[in-house]
Amino acid sequence: MLERLQEICEEARAALNGACSLEELNEIRIRYLGKKGELTRVLRSMGSLSAEERPRIGQAANEIRDFIEKELAARTAALKEMVKEQKLRGDKIDVTLPGMPLPGGGKHPLTLVLEEIQRIFLGLGYSIVEGPEVETDYYNFEALNLPKDHPARDMQDTFFIGGEILLRTHTSPVQVRTMEKTAPGLPVKIIVPGKVYRRDDDATHSPMFHQVEGLAVDRRITFSDLKGTLDLFAREMFGPQTRTRFRPSYFPFTEPSAEVDISCVMCGGRGCRVCSQTGWLEILGSGMVHPRVLEVSGYNSEEVTGFAFGMGVERIAMLKYGIDDMRLLFENDLRFLQQFRS
C-alpha cells in the first residue's frame, strides 16, 4: 500500500505541474482528494490492515494529502496571477489616444432668441441696460404714469413683497432709471432684457417670463421712426417676407400706443388655426413715450420725444419655433431641448 501511495503522490505532482488552467486544477483535486478520489480509496481500505501497519500507512497518507493540498493552493495562486497578468495585458490602455468626447449641450431656445434680439438692436446702435428685478412701486407704476388710484393697475397681477416693494411686472422701470441718469443728455437708445413676474400660469402664460424693453429718446423722433424700427426687427427675426400691422391700443406710459402684429409665420398671412384665420399674430406693444414719463425722468417734453416698445421673449420664441405650449420652455425636457442644438 505504501507503493500505491507513492504512485499517487508522483501522479498528482506530474498532473499539477502540467495543469494550465483553474479548471484542470479542480479536476485534479476531485481525482485525488474527492469522495471517490484515489487517496480517499486508499484511506477507506485501511480497515483491512493490521494494527501495526495502520499508523504507518495513515501517517504516509496524511502527508501525501497535505502535499497535494499545498501544491494545489500554490499552483492555483500561480495560475490566478497568470490569468490576471494576461487580462491586464489584454486590457492595456494607450493613454496617448484621444479621449471619448463628452456629449455636447446646446443653448436654450430662449437664449437663442434673446441673443438674436440683442444682435438686431445692437446693430441699430442700441445699448444693453439691466435693472433690478425687485422694484419699488414708484418705478414700476407711478413714474410710468400709473398713480395708485389708476384703473390700469388692474391690468397686471403683481407679486408684492411688502409695503412699496414688489417683483417688477415689466422691464419698463429701467426706462425711467436710465433717463434719470442720462437727462438732459441725448440721445438715449437702449434695450432692456430681463425677467418679469406676474400672477399667471397656463399654456400661454407663466408667473416668471422674459421681456425686452426698447427705448429711443431724442429730438424730432416720430412714430415713423418707431414703425421703421419695428418693421426692420420683424423682418430680421422672422424673415424678409414678414409684413407688419400696427393697431391702436392703450398703454399708460405711451401715447399714442399700438399693438404690433406680423403676418402669420405658419400660413404667411392666408389664415390658419394658429392665427384664428386672421392671417396676423401679435408680437409686441409699442408707442410714443408719454410726455409725463419724459417730464418725471428729467426731460422737457416740449423739446424731446421718444418711442418705446416691449416684447415677451417667450412669445417670440413660440412663434419663431412653432411651440404651442409655453410650459415646454421651462420643463427642461431634453427631448424638447435637443431639437435646438446647432
Curated annotation (Swiss-Prot):
Report which superkingdom the organism of origin falls in: Bacteria
Single annotated GO MF: magnesium ion binding
Q: Does the keyword Protein biosynthesis apply?
A: yes
Q: What is its main location?
A: cytoplasm
InterPro entries the record matches: aa-tRNA-synth_II, aa-tRNA-synth_II/BPL/LPL, Phe-tRNA-synth_IIc_asu, Phe-tRNA_ligase_II_N, Phe_tRNA_ligase_alpha1_bac, Phenylalanyl-tRNA_Synthase, tRNA-bd_arm
Q: Which family does it belong to?
A: Belongs to the class-II aminoacyl-tRNA synthetase family. Phe-tRNA synthetase alpha subunit type 1 subfamily.
What is the protein's given name? Phenylalanine--tRNA ligase alpha subunit
